[in-house]
Amino acid sequence: MKRLFIFIISILLMLPIFAAKKEKVQQVDSLGRKIKTGWNFGALPSVGFDADLGFQGGALANVYYYGDGSQYPEYIHSIYAEAAYTTKNYGIFRVNFDSKGLIPKHRLTIDATYQPDAMCDFYGFNGYQSIYNQSLHKWNKNPDKMDVAAYQSRAFYKYKRDLFRFAADIEGTIWKDIKWNAGLGVLGYMIDECNIDMLNGKNKYEIDPETGQPTNPKAMNPAIEGLYEKYIKWGLIDQAEARGGWHPYLRAGLTYDSRNMRTCPTKGIYADAFFTYTAAFNAAYGQQAAAGYNHLQFNFNFRHYVSLYQDRVIFAYRLGVQNNIAGKSPFYMNSYLNTIFIQRVMYEGLGGANSLRGIMRNRILANGFAYANIELRTKVAKFDIGSQHFYIGLAPFFDLGVITQPYELDEATIKDKHTEDLNNNPKYTLPLDKYFVLDENGNIDQSEVYMPHMAAGLGLKIAMNENFVFSVDWAMALDKRDNAKWANFYIKMGYLF
């Protein structure tokens, strides 16, 4: 905790390396802000922290073009590039272009991203129906601070997931604030079990022949199967989806957008409704995917921004739903939150920094889900440094998610496969009630599948020129089954929505 606070303070003391086209601008807008014009360039170390991903290090740069400033704080063009890695072996390599001027009267966004993830979170299907037990993966060098008897592996709730994404989206105007949207892209998932030898590094797993105990207690035992491997053995994850696949997609929908700006609106409504058709090929590293993995999903999102006092106090909330309406989506795509425009490095749901802060990343995995985020955004101080405009804000928030389309589990097959696994591999197979919630009759409990997952917290925002927002969020889950830790911090760029 002490290291994290030192890290946050260090970041807050950093000022961007900033260069701009030299134009003496004296105009101010209706809120008294000095208007920016021309090209503005900002570069920063890509440093951050995520409760699920660890500390992040790298570099990022953002170029904005404001033209004559008549639309400020809206930009005409934005070019964003980032390369970074985290201490939990999660990588970000991304280039994004966003423009309202390249094609007259249209908005065009192009994004190319590669995200290697050596320890992607996997907590099973259907939320609370799947048991989360912190003792199974929590390791501490002090044995008194961990459950030695229950401990399995730090990778018990993990699998390896590398993702390549390319997306091109365009928006045009139908009438006033009503827009049409279309997009295409491809998602390439390369999936496997965690590479334990790589994760162990120099801490090789070896057994002392005299004591029969590991010579290095921190080293993970590669013989222990995590939840992902168990789901494959028991048939919950089909072999055709177990190793990933490549998925081209087409998207079309409608948008209503009356917001007065994109990054931090002070008033207005944003709503979208769209369909995404996704195909499947090259699953399992070259094998043809089953036709059933072609699927159609529907998304609806509603955001509302209400000014309670000028631009200093804003009540903002977001409601959303994502459902599968035809075909079958592979398990790894059910944690991908579809969006009309790619603005963040990753859209994952439900759980984690991009959906439900304070709840573990991908804790709620189902065929369909709904969510809500509520924030009270305040600007407590405004000031200038040179020609740059800054503000400091605070934003208490509440996040909620529910399952709308659960997985239909074949309970008889699961029990048969588990019994077979228990007989063949008793040392590394736990009782069924360590994986699923069971009722008094020993059947998988259905009663809590639709129960809400909730979290709350507080955000600190430091913004430059309205569009460049440095964010520090603290959050905690309201149920320990979603996260046993209370100190969950997320240091990112921008608002959640």
Residue ranges of predicted features:
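Outer-membrane beta-barrel "beta-signal"
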Residues: 462, 485-497
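Transmembrane beta-strands of outer-membrane beta-barrel pores
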Residues: 49-51, 63-65, 83-89, 99-101, ...
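Transmembrane beta-strand segments that form the barrel wall of outer-membrane beta-barrel proteins
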Residues: 40-51, 74-87, 93, 270-281, ...
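Short loop/turn motifs that connect adjacent beta-strands in outer-membrane beta-barrel proteins
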Residues: 21-22, 26-40, 67-76, 102-108, ...
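Outer-membrane beta-barrel initiation region
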Residues: 20-101, 109, 194, 207-266, ...
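Transmembrane beta-strand segments of outer-membrane beta-barrel domains in Gram-negative
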Residues: 22-23, 27-29, 111-113, 120-311
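C-terminal outer-membrane beta-barrel translocator/porin domains of Gram-negative envelope proteins
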Residues: 240, 250, 261-388, 404-406, ...
